[in-house]
């Protein structure tokens, strides 16, 4: 990067990496090695003191291996394939300062993605334009509003396991939002009200309101609470995909998943409470509690043996017959033990309760699909001679229904900064076990396990 003149700066970059195979539980290679190369640029130009123009773009290409089993229970049906992905994007953004309390931003974006693998082939083009305007209304209100439009065009191909009712779609998304931050008591009591509005081609008009309040009685304490609604609108795969993934062990027939052209929006209402306190100059603590209520979640409904279409198969349809609740809390703390030694710790607890509709036949969604307890501890030291020594510990509870046991991970880093331009470091990751699983196999894709590793890094800044 560098400076073209007093008003124009630029940056270019290039990256390339390669990763070798993961391993299966028996220690054999998983044929999921991958590599990626990418490059890009960014230019920032200030033609006037009130204007900033940004142009940036990226291109990339990658190849990622995967191991499949046509029948997950039969090793003889195992085969390997690679995901070939490439694409690029371009972004242009203009920011105009209208006055000391008002700013206008207009941004446009284009993205092209090509993905090609054994089971899925897609080319996707996305064009997006949006406008944001921030201004003050009196001394109490700070208002931000905006409008947006997105056009997505894709082409998909039928494969041996995935077929589509539509081999290409042009989908439009119109959006807008408004938010008002109200200083009820300046610097003490803030109320933020807002909503996002969208219109999509699948489910029509969607509203996502939110409200947040924060109270700062002293410079060392803040209480806050929030309530919001969010949605996930259908994807093409929810509505018009047919996916053959397995063989039913009882009937001996293929399992075929069908999209549902009546699949509707999934929604969640989120309730949050929080407290932040700094009891001493060296200690900071945060507590956040949450309760989420989900409705119309995607379910996979077993319709039994079907001959439409032939040959005979077990028909499974996508529907909206699940509800759920998640609740829990997260406690985080930071302790500056010495000017050169810092500790950070986090504990999170989450509980998931599934509530299927009375007519649902989905038995695959389980309450053990999330880790109930997660603990993280991190130490960072700035040592004499420009050395740095960092250690991290992470515990993740078991995913019972996915047959993933709990695991404990330790990472260590030793770094040296002889001057501001150079950094040399060596890092060890997952040092306690030679390997461990962190996720389950997904349909026919076979999981590999995370291995311990050591790598070195050299960074030069100029």
Regions from the PLM with identified roles:
Residues 1-3, 13, 44-46, 225, ...:
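Conserved C-terminal beta-signal and adjacent last beta-strands/turns
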Residues 1-18, 27-64, 82-102, 137-138, ...:
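Transmembrane beta-barrel wall of Gram-negative outer-membrane proteins
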Residues 5-24, 36, 70-72, 101-117, 168-203, 215, 220-270, ...:
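Surface-exposed extracellular loop regions of Gram-negative outer-membrane beta-barrel proteins
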Residues 7-10, 50-55, 98-104, 140-143, ...:
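Repeated loop/turn-to-beta-strand initiation elements of outer-membrane beta-barrel proteins
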Residues 8, 101-109, 113-116, 216, ...:
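Membrane-embedded beta-barrel scaffold of Gram-negative outer-membrane proteins
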């Amino acid at each position: 990067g560098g400076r073209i003149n007093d008003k124009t700066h630029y940056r270019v970059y290039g990256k390339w990496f390669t990763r070798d195979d993961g391993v299966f539980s028996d220690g054999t290679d998983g044929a999921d090695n991958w590599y990626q190369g990418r490059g890009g640029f960014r230019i920032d130009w200030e033609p006037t003191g009130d204007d900033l123009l940004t142009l940036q773009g990226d291109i990339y290409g990658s190849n990622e291996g995967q191991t499949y089993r046509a029948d997950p229970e039969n090793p003889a049906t195992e085969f390997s394939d690679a995901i070939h992905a490439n694409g690029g994007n371009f972004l242009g953004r203009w920011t105009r300062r209208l006055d000391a309390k008002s700013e206008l931003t207009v941004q446009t974006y284009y993205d092209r993605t090509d993905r090609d693998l054994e089971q899925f082939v897609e080319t996707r083009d996305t064009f997006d334009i949006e406008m944001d305007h921030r201004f003050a209304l009196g001394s109490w209100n700070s208002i931000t509003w905006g409008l947006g439009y997105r056009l997505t065009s894709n082409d998909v191909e039928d494969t041996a396991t995935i077929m589509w009712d539509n081999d290409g779609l042009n989908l439009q998304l119109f959006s807008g939002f408004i938010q008002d931050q109200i200083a009820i008591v300046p610097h003490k009591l803030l109320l933020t009200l807002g909503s996002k509005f969208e219109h999509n081609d699948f489910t029509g008009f969607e509203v996502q309101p939110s409200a947040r309040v924060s109270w700062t009685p002293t410079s060392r304490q803040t209480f806050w609470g929030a309530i919001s609604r969010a949605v996930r609108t259908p994807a093409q795969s929810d509505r018009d995909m047919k996916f053959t993934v397995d063989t039913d062990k009882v009937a001996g027939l293929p399992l075929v998943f069908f999209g549902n052209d009546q699949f509707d929006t999934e929604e969640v209402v989120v309730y949050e409470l929080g407290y932040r306190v700094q009891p001493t100059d060296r200690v900071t603590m945060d507590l956040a509690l949450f309760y989420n209520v989900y409705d119309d979640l995607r379910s996979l409904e077993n319709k039994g043996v079907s001959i439409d279409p032939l040959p005979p198969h077990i028909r499974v349809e996508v529907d909206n017959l699940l509800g759920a609740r998640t609740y829990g809390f997260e406690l985080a703390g930071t302790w500056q033990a010495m000017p050169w030694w810092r500790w950070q710790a986090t504990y999170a607890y989450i509980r998931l309760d599934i509530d299927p509709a009375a007519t649902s036949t989905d038995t695959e969604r389980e309450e053990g699909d999330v880790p109930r307890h997660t603990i993280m501890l991190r130490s960072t030291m700035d040592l004499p001679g420009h050395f740095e020594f960092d250690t991290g510990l992470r515990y993740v509870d078991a995913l019972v229904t996915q047959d993933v046991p709990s695991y404990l991970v330790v990472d260590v880093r030793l770094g040296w900064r002889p001057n501001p331009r150079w950094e040399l470091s060596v890092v060890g990751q997952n040092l306690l076990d030679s390997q461990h699983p962190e996720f389950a196999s997904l349909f026919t894709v076979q999981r590999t396990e995370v291995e311990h590793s050591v790598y070195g890094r050299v960074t030069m800044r100029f």
